[in-house]
Amino acid sequence: MMKKTYTLAALLLSAVAGFAHADEAAQMKRGKELFLTAAVPACAVCHALKDAGAEGAIGPVLDELQPDAARVARALKDGIGAMPSFKATMSEADIAAVSLYVSKVSRAK
């Protein structure tokens, strides 16, 4: 009986991990889409980010800055320097997607 319980628990944990990975992949895809075109103005207009093929020259080069997701989210919500706030034009989910995308791809080596 105990072996069946452990097997069931392992299967459930595996399924949850699979769903989490699929959700992250969907968020990454949405984040890249927003970075390139959907945000107004698009992040790629100002920022350089190799994964996105973006060569903006106004804002920081994100591959060099390597911000974590919290830093990206804070900049999107509050604005920073010449960068405006996107709080009124982007949903929390979209801010989270861009934050995840930028933080993951800028830190990938």
Summary of predicted features, one role per range:
Residues 1-25, 107-109:
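N-terminal export/targeting leaders of redox proteins
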Residues 8, 25, 30, 56, ...:
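Extracytoplasmic copper-binding redox domains, predominantly the cupredoxin/blue-copper superfamily
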Residues 89-109:
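C-terminal capping alpha-helices of c-type cytochrome domains
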